[in-house]
Amino acid sequence: GNQFAESVLREQLSQSNLKPIDRHMVQEMVFGVIRNMILLDTWIDEKATRPPGKTRARTILRLGLYQIAFMDRIPEHAAVHETVATARDLRLHSQSGFINAILRGFLREKAIFLKRLEDWKTTQANIAYSHPNWLFKKWKKQFGDTEANKILQWNNQIPSSYARWNPLCG
C-alpha cells in the first residue's frame, strides 16, 4: 500500500532470523536497487530481447544486477547463482533461464556497462543517477546543466548514518 520501503523492510527484517550482518546486506541491496532503479532497468532492457514488464522477474533481475555491479564483497558467480535460486524459490521456474542468461550476459560485458555508466554521468545523468527525465529537465532549466548534475549526484548518494547519545535518556 502506502508504506515507505524503509518501514516495510524494517518490519520484514524484524520477523526474520537473519544475522545482523545479513540484515545489513539485505538492506543495502533493497535500498541500492531503489536508488539505482532507472539505471538497472536500462541495463535490463538493453540485454533482454524481450524485456520483462513490471514483474517479479524484473525485480529479481534488479537485485542480481545490483549485486554484480555494485557489491564487490559478493562473488559474481554467487550473485548469479543466488538470484536464479531466488527465482526458482518464488516459483518462477520458466523465467529462471532468462534471468540466468541476462545476468551472465551482463557479467561478460560488465566492464563495458560500467564504462558507459561513467560516460552517462555527463551525457545522460538522469539514467546514471536514476532520476526521471522530466525532473532532470526541470532542474536543468531551473539551475543549469552543471548544478542539475550535482543535484542528481548528491540526491543519489548513500546517506550517511549518524548516532548520537542523548543525555536526557540516560
Report the location of each language-model feature.
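Class I Rossmann-like S-adenosyl-L-methionine
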Residues: G1-G170
